[in-house]
UniProtKB/Swiss-Prot annotation:
It comes from Salmonella typhi. The gene is cbiO. SMART domains: AAA. The lineage of its organism: Bacteria, Pseudomonadati, Pseudomonadota, Gammaproteobacteria, Enterobacterales. One of its GO terms (biological process) is cobalt ion transport. It is a peripheral membrane protein. One of its GO terms (cellular component) is ATP-binding cassette (ABC) transporter complex. Its EC number is 7.-.-.-. Coiled coil: none annotated. This is Cobalt import ATP-binding protein CbiO.
Amino acid sequence: MLATSDLWFRYQDEPVLKGLNLDFSLSPVTGLVGANGCGKSTLFMNLSGLLRPQKGAVLWQGKPLDYSKRGLLALRQQVATVFQDPEQQIFYTDIDSDIAFSLRNLGVPEAEITRRVDEALTLVDAQHFRHQPIQCLSHGQKKRVAIAGALVLQARYLLLDEPTAGLDPAGRTQMIAIIRRIVAQGNHVIISSHDIDLIYEISDAVYVLRQGQILMHGAPGEVFACTEAMEHAGLTQPWLVKLHTQLGLPLCKTETEFFHRMQKCAFREAS
């Protein structure tokens, strides 16, 4: 269980997170949305133990986080963060060594390291470029290497910061597929993103942050259909939700579902 209880965090005298009560164990994929400066990045750093709240707590397995060296090491094997810029967490020039780095530090046997690295590369669809030098990879490929580096730890929670930023449409589609495969293995994914359409499509629950507080929480369709809340948070609605709220069309979760329903309607009218 990863959650927060009355979480407060200040930078100097300025409160950034204000009494947050969040539970990320309730849904496979949880989306965090909000305008710049709402506290998403600070929340991620609190969840991973990089920052320590002045009041309240991050809860792991129902208990306040242990900030000792041993406690944080244990946490980061179960709660892994993948930053927006993959360059921040890639240190080697060859992919296998980079992904295996954390496992070797933990003293994991080489045979187990080989197995985990191979599984992680398969999961992120990176087997076909695993032998290329990292400096020759595209931005999207580097993102996949960074995710693989988190997956080898067999973390139960994966924090993804802007996973589709800088990706072309094909790369974005691949990233969605990767997230779905991670969740299919029984893991939890928490996504912070300005890609509202991504959050709507892939999340099971959404928290909307505004000035360090929770403005709204619920299922994506319910949250994003609330025009007033979206405007108050400084956000726009996903395009599929706009079609529903502004034109009265059926609310669909994905583009594929939308066009399938439209084709069925067109076929019935033509008949």
